[in-house]
Regions:
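Intrinsically disordered, low-complexity terminal tails/loops enriched in metal-binding residues
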Residues: 17-151
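Sec-dependent N-terminal signal peptides
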Residues: 3-14
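N-terminal leader/targeting segments
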Residues: 1-3, 29
Length: 151
């Protein structure tokens, strides 16, 4: 029985360490483009577009910690990457383009004395045209916990 477990455990370890992301970890739900790839800590990470690669380049460890299910290639590497030192924002997704991940480097706007993270200048323009609409919808969807908190 022990002889059987060694190859099985080895296979699982290799499979996990060779895992790759199947969708973009920043524009969640978007298919990856095999040409939009970076290597980080010896692992390939695929994205849907160049814009996401640029976002990744600014803060890869934040994205790994925020989206572990979408980045299986980094499973079990928390200590090596120092992810315990990475502090996640309360807000994970954007209120205007809500399928997109926010990072500490995302553009921001102040709402009720709290910082709300957006995607880009276009999102800021859309948000500013009807902030109440986006805030109300995002709070209902649980996207703006910093505004939903009472106290």
């Amino acid at each position: 029985m022990k002889l059987f477990l060694i190859p099985l455990i080895s296979f699982l370890y290799i499979a996990i360490s060779n895992a790759e992301n199947k969708e973009c970890p920043i524009m969640v739900g978007d298919e990856i483009d095999e040409e939009e790839v970076v290597e980080f800590e010896g692992k390939k990470v695929y994205f849907c577009c160049t814009a996401c690669v640029k976002i990744w380049d600014k803060n890869p460890k934040y994205i790994i910690k925020a989206m572990p299910k979408l980045l299986p290639q980094f499973s079990g590497m928390d200590e090596k990457l120092g992810l315990d030192k990475v502090e996640l924002l309360d807000q994970r997704m954007r209120p205007v383009y809500n399928e997109r991940l926010v990072t500490p480097d995302s553009p921001t706007v102040e709402v009720e004395g709290k910082t709300v993270y957006l995607y880009n200048k276009s999102a800021l323009r859309r948000f500013n045209k009807s902030p109440e609409k986006y805030i109300e919808k995002a709070i209902k969807e649980g996207l703006l916990p910093q505004l939903a908190k009472k106290g």
